[in-house]
Amino acid sequence: MAMTYHLDVVSAEQQMFSGLVQKIQVTGSEGELGIYPGHAPLLTAIKPGMVRIVKQHGEEEYIYLSGGILEVQPNTVTVLSDTAIRGQDLDEARALEAKRKAEDHIRNSHGDVDYAQASAELSKAIAKLRVIELTRKAM
């Protein structure tokens, strides 16, 4: 049996996942993080993107995160996010429309603030589309 640890993924609205996992992959403020059993304690910010969960028996699940906090303790990992959406619950048409609008805003931005905001929105839309793609492949 593979080594595991307990993972909780919680949004402001609900608990998205709670159970034993082999590993997770998430984008932290300093880059990609792979959290395996026995990982050193850690507290870091999470960038908008996804958390890839490899469950106890090897099944994979993808959840979109709007950003948040990752806490790693010896036997428990907690992901806290303002918004967390399961891959199968994401709306591809809305994500594509958000991507198109963000690209338009980038082309028509007037100043650093406009560009930074549009760039952040584009990153979120691309992350949602990536979660949708990976969720389809995993099914």
UniProtKB/Swiss-Prot annotation:
This protein's record includes keyword Heme = no
Please give the Gene Ontology molecular function terms for this protein: ATP binding; proton-transporting ATP synthase activity, rotational mechanism
Q: Cite the Pfam families for this sequence.
A: ATP-synt_DE (PF00401), ATP-synt_DE_N (PF02823)
Tell me the SUPFAM superfamilies matching this sequence: Epsilon subunit of F1F0-ATP synthase C-terminal domain, Epsilon subunit of F1F0-ATP synthase N-terminal domain
Cross-referenced CDD domains, in alphabetical order? F1-ATPase_delta
What does the UniProt entry say about where the protein is found?
Answer: Cell inner membrane
Q: Does the keyword Protein biosynthesis apply?
A: no
Domain of life, per lineage: Bacteria
Q: Which GO terms describe its cellular component?
A: plasma membrane; proton-transporting ATP synthase complex
Which keywords fit this entry according to its UniProt record?
ATP synthesis, Cell inner membrane, Cell membrane, CF(1), Hydrogen ion transport, Ion transport, Membrane, Transport
Tell me where it mainly resides: membrane
* Quaternary structure and partners: F-type ATPases have 2 components, CF(1) - the catalytic core - and CF(0) - the membrane proton channel. CF(1) has five subunits: alpha(3), beta(3), gamma(1), delta(1), epsilon(1). CF(0) has three main subunits: a, b and c.
What this chain does, per the record?
Produces ATP from ADP in the presence of a proton gradient across the membrane.
Under NCBIfam families, the record lists: ATP_synt_epsi, PRK00571.1-4
| Name of the featured protein | ATP synthase epsilon chain
